[in-house]
Design a protein with these regions (language model features):
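Short aromatic-glycine-(Arg/Gly/Cys) micro-motifs in beta-strand/loop hairpins
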Residues: 1-22, 72-96
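Intrinsically disordered, low-complexity charged/polar segments
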Residues: 58-63, 133-145
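A cross-kingdom feature marking solvent-exposed beta-strand/loop segments within repeated
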Residues: 12-30, 47-50, 93-101, 121-123, ...
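Mixed-charge, glycine-accented linear interaction segment located at domain edges/termini
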Residues: 100-140
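Short, structured motif recognition centered on aromatic/hydrophobic residues
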Residues: 3-9, 25-28, 37, 41, ...
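Short, well-structured hydrophobic secondary-structure segments
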Residues: 30-62
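Extended, compositionally biased
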Residues: 52-79, 87
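Short, low-order "capping/linker" segments at domain edges
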Residues: 68-73, 140-152
Length: 152
């Protein structure tokens, strides 16, 4: 189970015209706590930002699953709200449960296509209620270091 945190980084960015401008960019980090999320985003951003930067905001993000893409054109992240439809055994009524997933794609049509591909093996019936582009710049899932050995 992943716990995702949306971290906002504020720094001075050199624009295309050569001027410096203060910008705030959101990133998504997989971490166990707010403290770890802050440490991870600082570690991930340090090589890419010259000069000072601050973590201006950290909040929990409610994503149940991620569908990343290796395609170069897929440079945007789309938030998709899915509604799973199940039958209640006792009453026989339909029960709807919503969940949010994140899909990396080139555009809206591509996001829906990749979402359907990712959900192909799902046994439950679902409906796509919403697909919208997010302002997320990048996503950093947790990966164990190769030299980290589990304690015995």
């Amino acid at each position: 189970m992943h716990t995702w945190f949306e971290c906002k980084i504020r720094y001075e960015k050199t624009m295309d015209n050569g001027m410096n401008k203060k910008v705030t960019e959101p990133y998504l980090v997989d971490a166990l706590s707010f403290t770890e999320a802050e440490a991870r985003i600082i570690e991930e951003m340090t090589p890419f930002i010259s000069g000072e930067f601050t973590v201006s905001d950290i909040k929990r993000a409610n994503y149940s699953e991620l569908f990343p893409s290796e395609e170069e054109a897929a440079d945007r992240w789309f938030k998709c709200k899915l509604i799973f439809i199940t039958l209640d055994e006792k009453s026989g009524a339909e029960k709807k449960t919503s969940t949010q997933v994140l899909v990396q794609a080139a555009d809206l049509r591509d996001a829906v296509k990749k979402l359907d591909e990712g959900m192909k093996g799902t046994m439950a019936d679902y409906q796509i209620a919403l697909v919208s582009e997010t302002p997320l710049m990048d996503v950093y899932p947790y990966s164990a270091e190769p030299n980290d050995k589990p304690e015995v």
